[in-house]
Amino acid sequence: MNRPIFIILIGYIIGILWGLYLKISIVFFYIILLILYYISNISKFKKKKFFHYIKILIKFNVLSLIIISSLISNIIIKFQTKKYQNLYHDGEELKIQVEIINNKKEKQYYNRYKIKVLSSKHKDTYLYMTTKKNLEYGEILEIQGNFSEPSEARNYKGFNYKEYLKTLKIYGTIRAEQVKKIDVHKGILYYANKLHLKIKDNLEKTYNSNTMPIVLGVLLGDTSEIDEETREDFSQSSISHVLAVSGLHVSYIIYLSEKSTQGIFGQRKSRIIEILILFIYMAITGFSISVIRSVIMATLMCTAFLVYRKSDTLNNISISAIIILFMNPYNLFSTSFQFTYAGTIGVVFFRPIVEDFIMNIKIKSPCLKEKYTNFCIKHNSFVEEIAVAISAQFMTMPIIITKYNFISLSFIVTNILVGIIIGPLVIGGIIQILVTFLSLKIGTEIAKVVQIPITALSLISKIGTKFPITNFKVITPDTWQIIIYYFIIYIIYYRHKIKKIQKYSFNQKIILKISKYVYSKRKIIIRVFTIILISSIIIKKIPGDLKIYFVDVGQGDCCLIETPKHQKILIDGGGQKNFDIGKNTLLPYLFNRKILEIDYCIISHFDQDHCGGILYILEQIKVKNVIIGKQYEDSTNYNKFKEIVKKQNLNVKIVEAGRRINIEKNLYFDVLWPDSQKMISDNAINNNSLVCKLNYNKFSMLFTGDIEEIAEKEIVSKYENNISILKSTILKTAHHGSKTSSIEKILDVVKPQYAFIGVGENNTFGHPSNITIENLEKRKIKIYRTDKMGEICIKITKRAIININTKLNTS
């Protein structure tokens, strides 16, 4: 059997996925499979085609490896899942002994540490600890505080902090009220961390403040000092991988090690020294997944040399992946794991295909073709750089799109330029680090030279974002689309590989037959896909139900409406002072909902918690129409809005009471407030919020912005002769359920069946008020609130049948 380790990896991944997503027992499934396999070997069934194909496609030794490895990983993941479920309860008070196992991360109001539990039944469990105290790596503490369970995704396909922490093997956070230092554990990792801090201190002394954060990122994988704008530039230019210590860095360390030790100790001893240096480097850089993968693969290559065996790249990749997944099965869902393995597989297996393609580009002119061929032969390293960039990008493309929702076509240029300077940068940087330990003065002089490629790297990241028509925003792909993408990549790879094989194995013959059959039917397959694509477009044009999504944006309001004819309406967008809701929550949410264009954007008023996210959206995607109420007071946000309108050339409609906004047949908004005849000067921005009523057949929803009691009374007074216009099925409770809003008088007039409250979890304003909740409950109005339920999804049929679901299970 070729490459059994790869088969074991496949089985191991199957076991993890099965344990997490399928309720049926994997043991039961394998029993059925083995019975089928046994039947296929009984003579009277041998001629049956169904069982014949089972026997062909599943060899017993392959099946055995998959079963054993998947059962092991399935047991491990189920044990891990059970451990998460039976740990501590949210809010539980703990008194435990712990050890600090990383350096502090400074937050706005506290310091955060990663800790390992040393006492209690949950020994060796990892947690985050928050405290205002300054503590050090290796300190053993006795702490007392409350346990906080990490939050889950609060919106559709939103960021799941709980699942993210699982990839770090962290179970939650303890807010330490009391901290008592007991001892210091001075193990190997303690001294590795001391070395890391010393290197960081030397870098800060020898590099200027502009280049030092990038040097830290490139050489140590420490990106904590890099500002958000620089991160964004590196990401948009498709070169963010240089800030994560990876195989590229490890290869240069191996190169330096070989050159400096081989002449003195010989090849075999130098390999042992290389392994030691790599493990030290791995400890210094903090055991990131990409470094662990690179070091394991390099160690296997060196070990193969020492025992006179040929090293196999696929086996090395598989062994490293199995080790990393054995350490933590949830690493399978880590972006770092996915990037490092997709990129490595792309470079190792797909690069030769890209190189062949570049070398064999068909040019009609014989003269030009000869010149092109000669150029490729003479500049083979240049062709290789292009092939590396393309192959890595092709394999990581679905991950990039899923995480960042953009495609950059400048990646070839930026990665070629980075490929030229990264070698001198890493080698020069490592030499500078070593020399600085001997002489700070000489180290400072070397740093001046290393700063040249660092400055060039920073310049490339900025230029990469400026290329015209190269960066495209894209919606989040579905899982089935990603599977099809990688299946096509695999077919391309296998067809290329199979052409170069003289003698085929049994499995290769089967796969070749399948690929030939697929290729022979390519026209039919293309037609089928075209029909499916056209059908999906037609289906999207068919009128459906009215859908309203009350998005959880923390302490703020945001509502997305999809009309029966699939128009998109966005009402408010939340916003916080210290967190960019638009960038981090609202825009990704729209991409996850397959939205690249908004038909109507309605801003109730220009308080940060209503317009903050909207202002970002207006700059990022196409918005056809913007609707605002008449403004009676200037504000910073309103001035910013006017600048964006001018820059983006947006179509703005200013409305007030009495206006009707027709969206489509049987669906329109009635504007009920503000009224220029009854302008309120007290807290003008809130009390002159745009109040509008969505009408769809027999269903209605009243949007109230942040109006308070004074405005509510004015509205009731204004429509006392036509009070039915205020009656609504759903009330968007004003001002997040504040005690200054939702007076009994307006509740009696609106008579809602449901009340929605957009409010932040554990907010400092005391929203929603107990008085408001009591007033709603007294009238038997069903309450939905984002702090407890997350996103609220409403589906309304033509007959006004309402179906409401929430993201978080509140039972």
Language-model segment annotations:
Residues 69-241, 583-593, 597, 631-633, ...:
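Membrane-interface helix/helix-cap signal primarily in integral membrane proteins
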Residues 625, 712-790:
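Cap/insert and terminal regions of metallo-dependent hydrolase folds
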Residues 326, 330-333, 462-600, 646-730, ...:
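Core dinuclear metal-dependent hydrolase active-site scaffold
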Residues 1-85, 195, 293, 498-504, ...:
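N-terminal leader/targeting segments
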Residues 167-297, 302-303, 378, 394, ...:
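Aromatic-rich juxtamembrane segments at the membrane interface
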Residues 3, 7, 15, 45, ...:
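Hydrophobic alpha-helical transmembrane segments in multi-pass membrane proteins
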Residues 598-609, 631, 731-735:
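Metallo-beta-lactamase
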Residues 608-646, 752:
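Active-site HxH/HxHxD metal-binding segment of metal-dependent hydrolases
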